[in-house]
């Protein structure tokens, strides 16, 4: 489904199944009316059954894992607003975060917008001054808008950044592994610390163990 006010933009990059030429506000109003009229009870039951048949697993015999990080986040920030960047950490977040309310998770799904997380988290904090805002990002995505640390300081928007630093563009490398015969290109960021925050005002640390994370 492609909604665009400009007819020339429809199917310009990707051929779409359902083209809708409309102002976004009008189209979204109609979509909301349609969505609210649907009974989702059966669909929710099916999802609950899938969860029972395919429970999430977590290894505990190999040091700190991404899954353990989210386990600790769930215990500590129950009412926080969570924001993800785009990458492997985004997949982990959507699987392992436990959400207690609507509008608690902000993510850019399926759009490949690396660098989205940190600026979006700053905006979420400005709009929710009374809540903690936790941004999950990777070393690749964070570097795309790393300059926004200065914005966060100037706007007095303290955001908690949880940075998964594996020295790779992890999801791109995974695609190269699965679909391109392990021909890796431009995905290794080499081993270095991505901790320039201390020179700009915020505090940064690299915890070696899971209990030290929080």
How would you name each of these model-derived features?
Residues 1-2, 18:
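Extended active-site and interfacial segments that coordinate phosphate-rich ligands
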Residues 2, 83, 136-137:
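Generic enzyme active-site microenvironment
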Residues 3-9:
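Short, polar loop motifs at secondary-structure junctions
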Residues 10-21, 25-31, 92-214:
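Thiamine diphosphate
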Residues 20, 24, 28, 40-43, ...:
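Generic structural signal for well-ordered, non-membrane alpha-helical segments
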Residues 36-37, 77-79, 129:
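Short glycine/proline-enriched coil/turn segments at helix->beta-strand junctions
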Residues 37-50:
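Flexible, glycine/charged-enriched surface loops at secondary-structure junctions
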Residues 48-125:
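Active-site diphosphate/adenylate-binding microenvironment
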């Amino acid at each position: 489904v492609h909604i665009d006010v400009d007819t020339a933009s429809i199917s310009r990059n990707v051929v779409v199944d359902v083209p809708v030429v409309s102002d976004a506000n009008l189209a979204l109003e109609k979509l909301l009316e349609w969505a609210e009229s649907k009974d989702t009870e059966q669909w929710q039951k099916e999802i609950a059954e899938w969860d029972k048949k395919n429970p999430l697993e977590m290894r505990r015999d190999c040091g700190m894992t991404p899954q353990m990080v989210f386990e600790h986040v769930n215990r500590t920030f129950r009412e926080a607003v969570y924001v993800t960047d785009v990458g492997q950490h985004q997949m982990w977040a959507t699987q392992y975060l436990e959400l207690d309310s609507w509008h608690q998770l902000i993510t850019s799904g399926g759009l490949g917008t690396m660098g989205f997380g940190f600026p979006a988290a700053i905006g979420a904090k400005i709009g929710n001054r009374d809540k903690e805002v936790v941004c999950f990002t990777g070393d690749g995505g964070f570097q795309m808008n790393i300059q926004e640390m200065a914005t966060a300081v100037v706007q007095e928007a303290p955001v908690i950044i949880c940075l998964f630093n594996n020295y790779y563009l992890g999801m791109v490398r995974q695609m190269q592994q699965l679909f391109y015969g392990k021909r890796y290109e431009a995905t290794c960021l080499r081993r270095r610390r991505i901790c320039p925050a201390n020179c700009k005002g915020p505090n940064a640390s690299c915890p070696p163990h899971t209990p030290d994370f929080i």
